[in-house]
Amino acid sequence: MSFTVRCRIVVLSLSIVAALAMVDKSAHAGMEEAVKAMQANDLATAEKELQVLIKERDPRAQFLAGLYIYGNPESKMYDVNKATPMLLDAAERGYVPAMLPLAGAYAEGKGVPKSAYEAYKWILIAERWNAPVVPQSYEPLLRELKPDEIEKAKAAAVAYTFKTK
């Protein structure tokens, strides 16, 4: 390979690295601006800032939008049919902060069919990944479930593997 070709490859490689760094910075900037907007209770701006990240399935953005923008009953944008799928996608890919709100959505049937089994399973998965789970969050579910359903949920939680795509 000639010197000129090698130089072009190096320049192309550096250009790609620079472009990726810029994308990462813009994603970081979008997240930072969204958090600032949420702190100022400007959920419309927060939603706008998170949209690109949500489309890229960034679990942090899905969590913030799913819990604070669409999942907040005090928000003008409250829509559990938008919120819960975002929380589910983030949780299924291993984003632990999304797991307990998702369990709550299943327990209450908000944006998903009501299911004590699914709620308990997600609580167990979250607990397995060191989320702080208090007994009050799952005791009512245990009263709804039969002993075999409890054991099935425990087994499902232990066997659960996160999606990678």
Regions found by a protein language model. Give the residues of each.
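Short helix-capping/linker turns of helical repeat alpha-solenoids
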Residues: 41, 55-59, 71-73, 92-96, ...
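Alpha-helical segment of the N-proximal tetratricopeptide repeat
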Residues: 29-45, 49-52, 56
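Structural signature of tandem alpha-helical TPR/SEL1-like repeats
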Residues: 39-48, 75-86, 113-121, 152
